[in-house]
Amino acid sequence: MGALTFRDVAIEFSLEEWQCLDTEQQNLYRNVMLDNYRNLVFLGIAVSKPDLITCLEQEKEPWNLKTHDMVAKPPVICSHIAQDLWPEQGIKDYFQEVILRQYKKCRHENLLLRKGCKNVDEFKMHKKGYNRHNQCLTTSHSKIFQCDKYVKVFHKFSNSNRHKIRHTSKKPFKCKECGKLFCILSHLAQHKKIHTGEKSYKCEEYGKAFNESSNCTTHKRITEKKPYKCKECGKAFNWFSHFTTHKRIHTGEKPYQCEKCGKFFNQSTNLTTHKRIHTGEKPYKCEECGKAFNQSSNLTEHKKIHTKEQPYKCEKCGKAFKWSSTLTKHKRIHNGEKPYKCEECGKAFNRSSTLNRHKITHTGGKPYKYKECGKAFNQSSTLTIHKIIHTVEKFYKCEECGKAFSRISHLTTHKRIHTGEKPYKCEECGRAFNQSSTLTTHKRIHTGEKPYECEECGKAFNRSSTLTTHKIIHSGEKIYKCKECGKAFRRFSHLTRHKTIHT
C-alpha cells in the first residue's frame, strides 16, 4: 500500500455543489480540511502545502481551485492508445477532468505516466490494462451533454437537464405536507425528514440523533475533547481556525482592512459584513414581508415578529414571550428588582429604556450629547447614527444638490426626491412610494398586521414609532416640557397643541 497523501483525505467541490451547501456546512468543510492537513503535518506525512489549503486559509471559495488544478494539467496518455482515447481533438478539453476522475477511480495510474512500450510483451500487458480501463472511458466519452453556465459534462441528457434546473427558478419537486418547493429531489427527501421526525444520523457516544449528517458531525466536534488551548486565558477550542481567530483578541491583530474607510477587523467575516454598509447590500430577505437585512442574525430575530410562537413562559403569572430577554425583564415586575438607577436623583427603574426616558427630565429633553460637535439627541440610537457623519467618509454625492452619503443605497433613495420616482406600488390601492420600507409599512393598513407588541400590556401596533410613543403611558414620564410655563406632557403632539395657548 502506498504512502498516505493529503489528496487521499481531501474532498473537492464544483461550484454548483459548493452553492448547495449552507454557511454552516461550508465552514464545517473548511475546518475539517484544515484539521486533516495539520494532522498530516504533525505526523510528518505532508511535505508541501497544497493549493487547496492555501485557498482555505485565505477563506476563499475552494471550487475555483478545482477547475484550474484539474484542467490545467492534462494526463500524459500512452502513445499506443492516444488515438483511441481522443477520437476528436475538439472534445479533449471537455473530458480532461472526467478522464482524470475515471483514472483515479479505476486505480490505473500507470496509464497516466507511461508514454511508450519497450517491446511487444510490455505492450500486450499495457493494452490489457487499457482494455479493463476502457470500460470506464466508454462512459466518459458519452458525457457530451454540457451545461452552458458552468463547464460540466454528463453521462445522459436527462442528467444534464436535471442539473440545468439548478440555474433556473424552476422547482418541480413539491412537499405534500407544507407545499415547499425544491429544484433537486434529494433536497426534498432531506426536507421530508422534518415532517416524519426521522433522524438517521446518530452519535454513538451520546446517542443523540440528527436528520442531517453535517449536524451530527458538528455535534461530535462540540462534545469531543478540545485540543487547541489558549496559553493566555486557558480557553480551549475544537477547531484550529477558531483558536487562531481567538488569539487575535490578546494580540490585538486586525489583518482585514476595509478599502473604503480604512477600518480594520480581526475576522474576514466581520469585514464582509462591514462592507455592506458602503454597498448597501442586504442579502438576507424575509419571505413574509420582503424586508431585507445585511446580517443573517438580524433576519433570524426579525422572523419572530411573524411567528406567533412564544416559547418563553413566566412561571409566576403564565405570561409568554417571544424572546428570553423580554422574559428576564418581565420577571423584575414580580421580584421588584430595579437595577437601573438615576445618578441625578437616585430614582431606580426595572428597565434601561425607562431610565433613559427619565433622564430627559433632568437634561431638558436631549441627554445624549456628542462631544465632537456639541449636538444633542433624545435617544442613544440617534446619537449612534449621527456619529457616522463624523467617522465615515461620504463617498456618494448627489449631483443635483451636493448632499453626500456614506451609502450608495441612501444616495439612490435620495435621488428620488429630485426625480419624483416612486417605484414601489401597492397592489391593493395603487398608491406608490419611493422606498420599499414605506410600502411594507403601508401594506399593514390592508392586512391588519401589527408586528410591534407592547411587553407591558400586549397592545400591538403596525409601526415601531407608535409603539415607542405608547410605552410612555406605562412609564408615567412626561418628557415634553413647555419652555414658557414649565408644564410637561407625555406626548409631543400634546405639547404642540398646548403651545397654541401662549401664541
Swiss-Prot record:
Location (main, coarse): nucleus
Signal peptide bounds: none
ZnF (C2H2-type) intervals: 145-167, 173-195, 228-250, 256-278, 284-306, 312-334, 340-362, 368-390, 396-418, 424-446, 452-474, 480-502
Single annotated GO MF: zinc ion binding
CDD domains found in the cross-reference section: KRAB_A-box
Pfam families noted in UniProt: KRAB, zf-C2H2, zf-H2C2_2
Subcellular locations according to the entry: Nucleus
Keywords: DNA-binding, Metal-binding, Nucleus, Repeat, Transcription, Transcription regulation, Zinc, Zinc-finger
An individual GO BP term: regulation of DNA-templated transcription
Any one cellular-component term (Gene Ontology): nucleus
Domain of life: Eukaryota
InterPro entries per the UniProt record, alphabetical: KRAB (IPR001909), KRAB_dom_sf (IPR036051), Znf_C2H2-type (IPR050758), Znf_C2H2_sf (IPR036236), Znf_C2H2_type (IPR013087)
KRAB domain mapped to chain residues: 4-75
Family, as annotated: Belongs to the krueppel C2H2-type zinc-finger protein family.
Task of the protein: May be involved in transcriptional regulation.
Protein name as it appears in the record: Putative zinc finger protein 730
Annotated organism of origin: Homo sapiens (Human)
Gene that encodes the chain: ZNF730
